[in-house]
């Protein structure tokens, strides 16, 4: 199995569940010429219906629960969810907020965690590669 066996570009959809935007800036940094992940076929898309990977930043407030579930359901199978940043795992700076429901993995299943506040772009790229491998394994299981 190689990363070349995925026949098209890997499409990533990003949703901010309520972060401070630090993680969002690092996701955008991955797309800049310094890292240029598009040369490897990793593309940010504007619709969850086109995505292979869902990248979620921030903790989940009450207002985002139904939207996050709806976005997750719109992504076609096989799909992988990345939790980017410490806020979505434990609350981070928003830990004691009255409006938080909890970490992302209590709302939707998370496959790959990217810790950090904010995580480095290299860590995000490494997580996307792990997600890519999981997608390939899921695609192989569907074929066989």
Task: For the regions a language model picked out, list residue spans one by one.
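Iron-sulfur-associated redox domains of electron-transfer enzymes in respiratory
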Residues: 1-144
